[in-house]
């Protein structure tokens, strides 16, 4: 609904219960336009209200759980009651004085242009129309072309022109005067064209205080960049309206409502402002120069003075920054063109103590180098909602997902960090500040030249886990542009050795004070490297230079589901469902089904006419919609029997449905039908007029409604006769059979009124746990011989056929002979029937043929599965002379494919009977043992590859490789191999490698490792089962989660209640596990096996548990001079205390 000039939102929009995204950009909606209605919509996820007329955030929005909310910068409100301000009036031509006639016409044209231009937002309109004082008196004609510097007298005016935002041709940078002497705190800002912009005051902030703009994030509100700025600290790097990061020299147009742009940019355009630090005496908010009039435009001499002052300020900032890093402030400027300087106001800075810098190493700075000011917040109590300058979420957007920090910078040191995916020369300078620790003291020692930090905390890996971090105390990044000409450094002197404290090498610009690893910056290539630190114990070398170059890069191969799957964007759930935000839960699905059934069960007055019932009631439309989906087991397309008295028209509607007509004609229906539709000799249904008043509960007459699913169970609950041998319950509004006798269960499975596919599935999967085949045959025979109509007999034969097809592996030879004897008795009974004998005999002959083909092995259940697309070509090429296969040379997705093929072959060998035996008796059948041994072998192989890597660099690369393999297995829905790989990384022998894990915790690989490790925790096994149940086949489940759950179900629930009732709730839970594994067995993967790789994955050398622990201990002894200290702020390499 964007760009529609909407002025109001109707309250009826809240009736859209499944609305997730609303786009209302560029409309005319205000706070009283009904926007607050969106606060009552719980399903809303995305809302765009940019370029509207909102003046404040509606209070109802705080309750929404939005993933995206786009708003304009809020229009600030005055805290105090402001006086009525006079509007600017057009000058009137007086007949007595016509000397200013030309000027008056020009001003009138300006007013017309100003009135014709529609404001982009209320904020711009406020900036245009607000005035703090009365309008100036009309000047004379002489004042228009005056060059006098006295611009605030009554003889001069400020020209009223069109807002520069609407001036698309304006390219020159604006000149803002930042006078330091005799400036009022509440002075207005005057742009280069003379437009007076009054100072903005917020609702909860006193006049003259610090001004902020606010931006809404996904979960909370965090303050954005400073709203009003006369410096260039936020012109070098700022946020646009979409939350991205742009440079000021970009050619793209800037949104006028961009959050984080300075107020000077909002008025004058996107060019960086040039600060004029003249010491002129200005008052009343005016700004200007002695050689300028109207606050802008000036002579060349004034502009040259401005450039000189800007260079002087830039030099001072360089010196300050140089002292912070522990170096001298001597710098040489090679160029002085286009150098914006940094204003020392209005940002307060923290106290920085700089004693002595290293003067032995001169540093050259290029004049073209742009330096941004390091901003520190002032101490004080700050509301956590408005505490940091930048939240971790905004930093994530600014860095454009390039958030990898290879090594944690030390506390208090401004360390250039190379960002992942950046090109040469793309560096940022990070300063870690804290909102809680107000004063930061950076001091230096004469001997060590090493800065130390007091009361300073930071978090190095916050970008990887920004969802779980708060805005308080989060680090803030500011860009420090690097000059095009690298400075020249003299040859470094020998490093200073000290046993107590590490020294700073003369060639190094930065040092980590908390570790022996010394970080250096190579200015010639503009890349960050790390020098090699040696220890005095055992001469062990920790090559941090190689470690710094190691980085985790995702390597997940896509397919038709998703062409470019990435864990960093989708996480584990997104890899399984790339096209869905989330899967509907079972509870939500059950509620939808219950609501649809409840609508169908609406009571209709028995005295109402048929025409009114079918034309006006929602029953007809609901029943017709569900009847079209009668082939789906999730929808039962018929109403309950107890809901209608007059059913003639409804019966006609049901009979007109193809699925219902098949049922009444003896055809195949859902859940197993017979071949009676081929003969068509079944007794026709009685006329509708004859069955209008017939009770549905009478089993001796032909029923006119066939119920399925939940409606069938719900109808049984209303029958007083059936309730004698059955107990019902309800789960989330869905009716369930709780306890039942075997005789009643047989009756329900062959009931003439309907069927429940769920009840049939429970029986076929778990009947061997509570009964036996001979006992079931006995009850079926009794049901067939005592049936009062041919429909019951037909249902018995249909159920027997389905039983043989699904559970043929359960039948032994004696069971087959018993079944044939039962069918022979049924044949004799059919011969005695007068009607329907031919149809029943045909169904019986079909069942006998199926049994004979099953015994001979000639029965074909279904055709061989075919795929629409060919299998992907294996991504593996073996060289002719290469005998051995190296793990690091293989692609992760191809290893995952071969692991999936191996696991699926072993999974298909497990039978249903073996699953039941394991759940009841914990019997280890050969098929289950093979799956278990394969899982344990994969765990040992991964652990062996990690431990046998000789250096820490190789161990890190090996872990990165296995993380990518696990992610590819997860994407292929091979949960078994993915869990095995992560279980190997959780072994105690692997977790002993503290140096290795200390580095990995600060890389992108840590996020998927931790998320996978959480799934294998005992408390999260239920969550893993829910994920496996929600995916579609093909998939390979982690059987450990299913088997442990089945054992707990069997041990914690009784099989027989009150000595005769079968506990159907227990077997319902058991049946769900069996069905999940069965579905995974039936669906195959469309992959190509590679014999060489499969042999490599099955015959590789592995170490035992004892050998793994021994090798890991040796690695720890070699690296005993270093330990890893893990805190909530990251991992830091420290020297072990003796």
UniProtKB/Swiss-Prot annotation:
GO biological process terms, semicolon-separated: Ras protein signal transduction; response to differentiation-inducing factor 1
Q: Ranges of Pro residues compositional bias?
A: 487-496
Q: Which residues form a coiled coil?
A: none
Species this protein is from? Dictyostelium discoideum (Social amoeba)
Q: What is this protein called?
A: Ras guanine nucleotide exchange factor N
Q: What does this protein do?
A: Promotes the exchange of Ras-bound GDP by GTP. May play a role in chemotaxis.
> What is any one of the record's Gene Ontology cellular component terms?
plasma membrane
Q: Where is this region: Disordered?
A: 126-180, 239-301, 319-360, 389-411, 473-540, 601-643, 660-680
| A GO term for molecular function | guanyl-nucleotide exchange factor activity
Superkingdom classification of source? Eukaryota
- Repeat (LRR) positions are 1-16, 18-39, 43-64
Per UniProt, the ranges with Gly residues bias are: 283-299
* Disulfide cross-links: none
Indicate yes or no for the key word Cell wall biogenesis/degradation: no
PANTHER family listed in its UniProt record: GUANINE NUCLEOTIDE EXCHANGE FACTOR, RAS GUANINE NUCLEOTIDE EXCHANGE FACTOR N
Question: Which keywords belong to this entry?
Answer: Guanine-nucleotide releasing factor, Leucine-rich repeat, Repeat
What the entry lists under Pfam families is as follows:
RasGEF
Per the record, where are the segments of Polar residues compositional bias? 263-275, 498-511
What the entry lists under InterPro entries is as follows: Leu-rich_rpt, LRR_dom_sf, Ras-like_GEF, Ras-like_Gua-exchang_fac_N, Ras_GEF_dom_sf, RASGEF_cat_dom, RASGEF_cat_dom_sf
Which segments show compositional bias classed as Low complexity?
140-158, 326-352, 512-540, 605-634
Q: Where is the N-terminal Ras-GEF domain?
A: 733-855
């Amino acid at each position: 609904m964007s760009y529609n000039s909407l002025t109001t939102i109707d309250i009826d929009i809240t009736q859209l219960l499944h609305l997730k995204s609303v786009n209302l950009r560029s409309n005319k909606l205000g706070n009283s336009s009904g926007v607050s209605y969106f606060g009552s919509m719980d399903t809303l996820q995305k809302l765009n209200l940019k370029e509207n007329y909102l003046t404040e955030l509606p209070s109802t929005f705080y309750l929404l759980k939005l993933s995206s909310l786009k708003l304009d910068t809020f229009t600030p409100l005055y805290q105090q009651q402001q006086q009525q301000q006079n509007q600017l009036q057009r000058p009137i031509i007086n007949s007595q004085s016509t000397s200013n006639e030309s000027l008056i016409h020009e001003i009138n044209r300006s007013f017309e242009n100003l009135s014709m231009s529609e404001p982009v937002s209320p904020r711009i309109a406020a900036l245009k129309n607000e005035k703090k004082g009365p309008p100036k008196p009309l000047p004379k004609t002489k004042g228009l072309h005056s060059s006098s510097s006295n611009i605030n007298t009554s003889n001069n005016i400020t020209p009223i022109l069109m807002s520069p935002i609407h001036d698309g041709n304006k390219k020159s940078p604006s000149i803002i005067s930042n006078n330091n002497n005799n400036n009022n705190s509440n002075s207005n800002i005057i742009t280069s064209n003379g437009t007076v912009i009054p100072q903005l005051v917020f609702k909860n902030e006193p006049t003259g205080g610090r001004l902020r703009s606010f931006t809404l994030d996904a979960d909370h509100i965090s303050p954005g960049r400073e709203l009003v700025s006369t410096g260039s600290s936020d012109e070098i790097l700022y946020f646009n309206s979409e939350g991205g990061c742009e440079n000021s020299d970009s050619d793209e147009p800037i949104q006028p409502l961009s959050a984080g742009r300075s107020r000077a940019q909002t008025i004058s355009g996107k060019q960086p402002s040039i600060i004029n630090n003249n010491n002129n005496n200005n008052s009343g908010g005016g700004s200007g120069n002695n050689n300028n009039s109207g606050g802008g435009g000036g002579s060349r001499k004034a502009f040259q003075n401005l450039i000189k002052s800007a260079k002087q300020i830039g030099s001072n900032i360089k010196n300050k920054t140089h002292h912070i890093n522990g170096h001298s402030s001597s710098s040489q400027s090679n160029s002085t063109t286009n150098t914006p300087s940094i204003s020392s106001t209005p940002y307060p800075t923290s106290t920085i103590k700089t004693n002595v810098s290293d003067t032995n190493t001169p540093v050259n700075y290029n004049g073209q180098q742009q330096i941004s000011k390091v901003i520190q917040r002032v101490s004080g109590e700050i509301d956590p909602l408005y505490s940091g300058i930048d939240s971790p979420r905004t930093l994530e957007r600014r860095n454009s997902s390039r958030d990898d920090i290879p090594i944690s910078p030390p506390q208090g040191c401004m360390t250039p960090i190379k960002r992942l995916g950046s090109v040469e020369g793309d560096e940022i300078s990070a300063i870690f500040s804290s909102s809680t620790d107000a004063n930061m003291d950076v001091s230096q020692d004469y001997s060590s030249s090493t800065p130390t930090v007091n009361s300073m905390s930071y978090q190095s890996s916050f970008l990887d886990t920004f969802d779980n971090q708060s805005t308080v105390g989060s680090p803030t990044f500011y860009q420090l542009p690097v000059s095009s000409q690298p400075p020249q450094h003299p040859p470094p002197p020998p490093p200073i050795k000290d046993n107590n404290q590490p020294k700073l090498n003369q060639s190094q610009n930065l040092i980590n004070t908390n570790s022996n690893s010394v970080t250096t910056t190579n200015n010639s290539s503009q890349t960050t490297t790390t020098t090699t630190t040696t220890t005095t114990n055992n001469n062990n070398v920790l090559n941090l230079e190689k470690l710094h170059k190691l980085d985790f890069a995702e390597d997940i191969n896509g397919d038709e589901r998703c062409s470019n799957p990435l864990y960093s964007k989708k996480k584990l759930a997104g890899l399984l469902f790339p096209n869905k935000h989330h899967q509907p839960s079972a509870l939500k699905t059950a509620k939808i089904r219950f609501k649809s059934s409840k609508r169908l069960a609406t009571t209709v007055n028995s005295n109402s006419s048929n025409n009114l019932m079918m034309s006006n009631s929602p029953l007809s439309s609901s029943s017709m919609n569900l009847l079209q989906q009668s082939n789906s087991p999730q929808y039962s397309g018929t109403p309950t029997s107890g809901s209608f008295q007059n059913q003639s028209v409804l019966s006609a509607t049901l009979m007109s449905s193809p699925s219902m007509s098949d049922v009444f004609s003896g055809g195949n229906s859902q859940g197993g039908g017979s071949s009676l539709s081929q003969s068509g000799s079944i007794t026709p249904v009685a006329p509708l007029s004859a069955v209008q008043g017939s009770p549905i509960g009478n089993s001796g007459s032909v029923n006119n409604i066939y119920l399925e699913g939940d409606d069938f169970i719900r109808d049984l609950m209303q029958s007083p006769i059936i309730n004698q041998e059955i107990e019902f319950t309800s789960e989330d509004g869905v009716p369930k059979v709780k306890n039942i006798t075997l005789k009643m269960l047989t009756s329900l499975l062959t009931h003439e009124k309907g069927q429940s596919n769920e009840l049939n599935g429970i029986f076929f999967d778990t009947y061997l746990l509570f009964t036996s085949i001979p006992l079931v045959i006995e009850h079926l025979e009794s049901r067939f011989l005592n049936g009062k109509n041919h429909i019951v007999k037909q249902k018995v034969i249909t159920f027997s056929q389905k039983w043989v097809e699904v559970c043929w592996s359960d039948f032994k030879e004696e069971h087959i002979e018993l079944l044939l004897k039962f069918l022979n008795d049924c044949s004799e009974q059919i011969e005695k029937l007068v009607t329907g004998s031919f149809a029943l005999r045909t169904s019986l002959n079909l069942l006998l043929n199926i049994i004979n083909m099953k015994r001979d092995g000639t029965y074909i259940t279904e055709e061989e599965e075919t795929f629409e697309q060919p299998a992907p070509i294996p991504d593996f090429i073996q060289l002719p002379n290469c005998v051995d296969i190296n793990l690091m040379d293989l692609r992760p997705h191809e290893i995952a494919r071969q692991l999936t093929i191996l696991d699926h072959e072993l999974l298909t060998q497990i039978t249903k009977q073996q699953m039941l035996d394991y759940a009841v008796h914990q019997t280890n059948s050969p098929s289950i043992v093979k799956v278990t041994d394969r899982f344990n072998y994969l765990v040992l192989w991964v652990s062996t590859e990690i431990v046998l890597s000789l250096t820490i660099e190789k161990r890190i690369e090996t872990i990165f490789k296995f993380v990518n393999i696990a992610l590819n297995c997860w994407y292929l829905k091979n949960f078994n191999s993915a869990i095995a790989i992560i279980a190997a990384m959780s072994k105690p022998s692997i977790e002993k490698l503290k140096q290795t894990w200390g580095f990995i915790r600060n890389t992108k690989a840590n996020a998927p490792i931790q998320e996978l490790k959480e799934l294998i925790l005992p408390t999260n096994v239920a969550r893993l089962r829910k994920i496996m149940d929600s995916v579609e086949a093909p998939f390979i489940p982690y059987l450990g989660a299913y088997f442990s759950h089945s054992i707990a179900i069997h041990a914690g629930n009784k099989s027989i209640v009150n000595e005769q009732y079968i506990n159907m709730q227990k077997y319902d839970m058991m049946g769900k596990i069996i069905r999940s594994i069965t579905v995974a067995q039936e669906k195959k993967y469309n992959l190509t096996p590679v014999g060489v790789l499969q042999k490599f994955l099955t015959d590789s050398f592995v170490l035992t548990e004892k050998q793994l622990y021994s090798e890991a201990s040796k690695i720890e002894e070699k690296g005993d001079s270093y330990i890893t200290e893990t805190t909530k702020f990251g991992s830091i390499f420290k020297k072990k205390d003796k």
